[in-house]
Swiss-Prot record:
Region (Disordered): 1-20, 126-156
Biological process according to GO: endoplasmic reticulum to Golgi vesicle-mediated transport; intra-Golgi vesicle-mediated transport; macroautophagy; retrograde transport, endosome to Golgi
Name of the featured protein: Trafficking protein particle complex subunit 31
Keyword Metal-binding listed: no
Pfam families, sorted: TRAPP (PF04051)
Lineage: Eukaryota, Fungi, Dikarya, Ascomycota, Saccharomycotina
Cellular compartment(s): Golgi apparatus, cis-Golgi network; Endoplasmic reticulum; Preautophagosomal structure
Family: Belongs to the TRAPP small subunits family. BET3 subfamily.
Length: 283
């Protein structure tokens, strides 16, 4: 017959149900008060991303991360086609998110930027004050007073967002040329800190366009003429266009010219439905 183990100085009321161990997401129960558990701390992630700030990752860190992605795919993929497809899928997941971010960011008027910056700084100070008030090392009376005042300010900002400073959303791009110019300028500047070197329409097929980059940033440390590693950027372009309502296929081609040995052309082939839709809408 099994025997129940009774812990010293512990009653049944303290342990009403079965426990799997220490709850790391909550922490020690005696350190959490009912007031602290109900405190709402508004997230600044979305507001910060809407406000344009030059936040750059170091090239060495990005190159190291990209190298690890390539190494992992080389170990798991059996064919070059499988490698390019999976690498493109990685970029696709980024591209579908960049459309909304850049559209919202382009909709914040320049006159609202000073007020938006002030909003973020006030929101940050309120969050820090709330975190300090919930720390277990403070005295009980001062913690209660500080937490109450912090909660009042947080409740006021609970419904606020940087999106309130957007008075008019940027119009959605409906033409192929408009969305490609947005990629050529805004998207490329966001990703690589410069616009792409050229945007060309094919003279042979009406559904083919080309974006040219004379000096690809991510693959500049990868020697050789193999363009398989460029399919990460192909995936970003494809995901961006797919989320914008322009389904297509994107491939990469190495075409050296002049002194640019790594000059890469990203060939975009739109589905026939995109051309038919544009012909019906705009003639």
């Amino acid at each position: 017959m099994s025997q129940r183990i009774i812990q010293p100085s512990a009653s049944d009321q303290q342990f009403p149900g079965k426990s799997d161990g220490y709850e790391y997401t909550v922490g020690p129960k005696q350190a959490i008060t009912s007031e602290a558990s109900t405190t709402y701390i508004p997230s600044r992630i979305y507001s910060e991303s809407l406000l344009f700030k030059r936040q750059e990752a170091s090239l060495s860190a990005m190159a190291f991360l990209f190298q690890e992605m390539i190494s992992q795919l080389h170990r798991t993929c059996k064919t070059a086609g499988d490698f390019e497809t999976k690498l493109s899928d990685y970029g696709h997941n980024i591209g579908i998110r960049l459309l909304e971010l850049l559209n919202f960011r382009a909709s914040v008027s320049p006159s609202s930027l000073p007020r938006a910056s002030a909003f973020l700084s006030q929101n940050e100070s309120s969050s820090k004050l709330s975190n300090a008030s919930n720390s277990p090392g403070m005295l009980a009376n001062s913690s209660t007073a500080t937490s109450a005042s912090a909660n009042e300010r947080l409740q006021e900002k609970q419904t606020e967002s940087l999106s309130n400073y957007i008075t008019k959303m940027r119009r959605r791009d409906l033409k192929i040329l408009d969305i490609l110019q947005f990629i050529h300028g805004t998207l490329w500047s966001y990703l690589f800190n410069h616009v792409s070197d050229d945007l060309v329409k094919s003279s042979e097929r009406d559904n083919e366009y080309m974006i040219v980059d004379n000096f690809p940033t991510l693959t500049q440390f990868i020697p050789g003429e193999n363009v398989s590693c460029e399919y990460f950027v192909c995936g970003i372009i494809k995901g961006f266009l797919f989320n914008a309502g322009f389904p297509c296929g994107v491939t990469a081609h190495r075409m050296p010219q002049g002194g640019h040995s790594q000059r890469t052309v990203y060939l975009i082939q739109f589905d026939r439905q995109v051309l038919d839709r544009e012909g019906l809408r705009f003639g």
